[in-house]
Curated annotation (Swiss-Prot):
Gene3D superfamilies: Cysteine Rich Protein. It comes from Mus musculus (Mouse). Its main location: nucleus. GO terms for cellular component: cytoplasm; cytoskeleton; cytosol; nucleoplasm; nucleus; Z disc. This is Cysteine and glycine-rich protein 3. It holds the Pfam family LIM. Positive regulator of myogenesis. Acts as a cofactor for myogenic bHLH transcription factors such as MYOD1, and probably MYOG and MYF6. Enhances the DNA-binding activity of the MYOD1:TCF3 isoform E47 complex and may promote formation of a functional MYOD1:TCF3 isoform E47:MEF2A complex involved in myogenesis. Plays a crucial and specific role in the organization of cytosolic structures in cardiomyocytes. Could play a role in mechanical stretch sensing. May be a scaffold protein that promotes the assembly of interacting proteins at Z-line structures. LIM zinc-binding domain 1 is required for self-association. LIM zinc-binding domain 1 and LIM zinc-binding domain 2 both are required for optimal actin-bundling activity. LIM zinc-binding domain 1 mediates binding to MYOD1. LIM zinc-binding domain 2 mediates binding to SPTB.
Length: 194
């Protein structure tokens, strides 16, 4: 049957796909609304699609159907499975939970609930994950992550530490770097012997 002025046929629903709603995969056209995994019906995009002949799948379902199988072939990183192997005649044994260590009493309700947080070396206040920057092996607030001399904001590429304090590379070189002739800034006057 001729296709008079219409677009290609959708690989899922077989209806006409017009250019504005078309997604192409593996030489076939799909409506944006039809571009779903044929197994789990999860919506797909160019980064999550895996094609097999004329069928499209999400990467997880594709791996289950067409990936390697057997003992030693995991489903890959990021895939959780509740398969215990009973269908293979394997016995699932849950490992015993380790005994919890005795905890000391903590006066703060927040500390007891969420654990003690680390302290910022500059201001001495608690550093929480959302504001944490690591420097010199210690946690800092983003606002405290500055050069101790000039106050310039630091990044991982321009930070140096000495004796637990942070410095930008310029201040570190001026204050702790080598001195004398041939090392940039002449800090001592050289006396001429006559």
């Amino acid at each position: 049957m001729p296709n008079w002025g219409g677009g290609a046929k959708c690989g899922a629903c077989e209806k006409t796909v017009y250019h504005a709603e078309e997604i192409q995969c593996n030489g076939r056209s799909f409506h944006k609304t039809c571009f779903h995994c044929m197994a789990c019906r999860k919506a797909l995009d160019s980064t999550t699609v895996a094609a097999h002949e004329s069928e499209i799948y999400c990467k997880v379902c594709y791996g289950r159907r067409y990936g390697p199988k057997g003992i030693g072939f995991g489903q890959g990183a990021g895939c959780l499975s509740t398969d215990t192997g009973e269908h293979l005649g394997l016995q699932f044994q849950q490992s015993p939970k380790p005994a919890r260590a005795a905890t000391t009493s903590n006066p703060s309700k927040f500390s007891a609930k969420f654990g003690e947080s680390e302290k910022c070396p500059r201001c001495g206040k608690s550093v929480y994950a959302a504001e944490k920057v690591m420097g010199g092996g210690k946690p800092w607030h983003k606002t405290c992550f500055r050069c101790a001399i000039c106050g310039k904001s630091l990044e991982s590429t321009n930070v140096t530490d000495k004796d637990g304090e942070l410095y930008c590379k310029v201040c570190y070189a001026k204050n702790f770097g080598p001195t004398g002739i041939g090392f940039g800034g002449l800090t001592q006057q050289v006396e001429k012997k006559e």
